[in-house]
Amino acid sequence: MSQGIITKVSGPLVVAEGLPEAKMFDVVKVGNQGLIGEIIEIRGERVSIQVYEETSGLGPGDPVVSTGEPLSVELGPGMLEGIFDGIQRPLDVIEKKVGSFITRGIDVPSLNREKKWKFTPKVKSGDKVSGGDIIGTVQETVIVEHRIMVPPAISGIVEDIREGEYTVTEPIARIKTDSGQIVEITMMQKWPVRKARPYKEKLPPEIPMPTGQRVIDTLFPVTKGGTACIPGPFGSGKTVVQHQLAKWADAEIVVYIGCGERGNEMTDVLLEFPELKDPKTEEPLMKRTVLIANTSNMPVAAREASIYTGITIAEYFRDMGYSVALMADSTSRWAEALREMSGRLEEMPGEEGYPAYLARRLAEFYERAGRVICLGSDNREGALTVVGAVSPPGGDLSEPVTQATLRVVKVFWALDSELAYARHFPAINWLTSYSLYSDVVEDYMNKNVSSDWGELRSEAMRLLQEEASLQEIVRLVGIDALSTRDRLVLEVARSIREDFLHQNAFHEVDTYSSMEKQYRMLKLIMIFYQEAQKALEKGVPFSEIEKHPVREKIARAKYVEESKLTVFDEIEKEIKKAMQGLIEGGAADA
């Protein structure tokens, strides 16, 4: 370990000299308290260090010690149900040690060193293994089996492997490599956060990831291994959408990063998730979740690390063959941390003061998502889906972080303050949002749910767009100037908005809709539209169609439980019968 001295302190940036062997992104201990920092620039003898803790009290002449290792995370049993800070320090352990506020220079291991885990081998002595092969399993929580893998760079013959209870640092197996060297394998691996974990092959993201949110799954779907962003102004519901995705997305593991957001939002997650049951296993959602809390009152520099820490943990679970969903809330705070460090380094600023390399850093982050064939001889598939929230100041979507994000992600869920103020949630604007996965998902849904899924979706989108243009006319000349056909379009589009797209995140039934239920709900509205068109053609007055009591049954369909979807068949019959009754009644009057 080489030791240098501080020459300058500027907020979270410390400049030091006397570290000749230092490398980029090495971790250093700064000052007498040993604050954790990372080298982000080397110029001759001088190194610039971003410190992940409060730097008040540091001054020129204080010592700096280089560890010679990059910032890494510990990967192994004990991460699930855990809550960590941006550099993977367990907050519950710190709280027991020093109380509610994190003191500076505290050094605690990320994974519990005392707890013993029951290890069950999957290979035997004499078997040949290579990087990524699963050599055994640990039942980490009731619903997640933690698969212990050979580190990527190691291959050889298993010399010795034993079943039993071990801590994460005790050897569970010995492998004789091709060069004759004996390597001891533990349940814990260390991995540098800025380096993507390797895989065999990247696959096209073709399988949809149901989220239970109707506006997302039907109109703007995301796939397993896809990328999505949620930009929106303050108060438009970004965090609630992220929480909904974390709760109900069809993923086996969820990694939730609270990056520079309010602390009470992480508290909500900590209080809600243990109470909520996973619909597939009926176990608490917390048992498949890893939380990284880097709230707005924590040091700014650690925000940058938190995003990398989270995605490295997510990649590790992906390598086991799991489908993983990563929520980053919010990437704007991360970009602001980049901007602050760039300013302190006196780099040339780009647009709005952000560094010129902002787009590259964002692309590198989203590039780590994907559906892959993992390393290992069993060719297992894993997927990592990334959903990033963006908080543009004043909801201005033309600002650099939103624009750089839109260049790399395939799904854009635009949150609208007007919809939010009108209490329409989720406030995803159906006219400006898009999904580049919709064609792939449409093929999948046509095969697996119903052959007319694609037609229903296209018709619903057409009606919503037609409604927007008709509303312009209504504002100018009033609704009475419209033909009855146009008034029906407005009425059906309103039904799509209020009875289908609007969803209550806090209602026990409406919070989640299966793909089957979403299809049945949309089909009801479209059957009403078709039957009402026939009634209009036969001369039935529009006012009678509009006021018919069957409309209320369509509106209440969202509260039908998943186990009672046969109710939709009855409502379909009622709609047809009601419209037929209006036609026959009109004919009798004539």
UniProtKB/Swiss-Prot annotation:
Disulfide bonds: none
EC code(s) of this entry: 7.1.2.2
UniProt keyword Transport, yes or no: yes
Gene3D superfamilies, per the entry: 2.40.30.20, 2.40.50.100, Bovine Mitochondrial F1-atpase, Atp Synthase Beta Chain, Chain D, domain 3 (1.10.1140.10), P-loop containing nucleotide triphosphate hydrolases (3.40.50.300)
Keyword Ubl conjugation attributed: no
GO molecular function terms noted in the UniProt entry: ATP binding; ATP hydrolysis activity; proton-transporting ATP synthase activity, rotational mechanism; proton-transporting ATPase activity, rotational mechanism
Chain positions recorded as ATP binding sites: G232, P233, F234, G235, S236, G237, K238, T239
Catalytic activity reported: ATP + H2O + 4 H(+)(in) = ADP + phosphate + 5 H(+)(out)
Biological process per Gene Ontology, one example term: proton motive force-driven plasma membrane ATP synthesis
Any matching Pfam family: ATP-synt_ab_N
GO CC annotation: proton-transporting ATP synthase complex; proton-transporting two-sector ATPase complex, catalytic domain
Keywords: ATP synthesis, ATP-binding, Hydrogen ion transport, Ion transport, Nucleotide-binding, Translocase, Transport
SUPFAM superfamilies assigned to the protein according to its UniProt record, in alphabetical order: C-terminal domain of alpha and beta subunits of F1 ATP synthase (SSF47917), N-terminal domain of alpha and beta subunits of F1 ATP synthase (SSF50615), P-loop containing nucleoside triphosphate hydrolases (SSF52540)
Family membership: Belongs to the ATPase alpha/beta chains family.
Physiological role: Produces ATP from ADP in the presence of a proton gradient across the membrane. The V-type alpha chain is a catalytic subunit.
Protein name: V-type ATP synthase alpha chain
Taxonomic placement: Bacteria, Bacillati, Bacillota, Clostridia, Thermoanaerobacterales
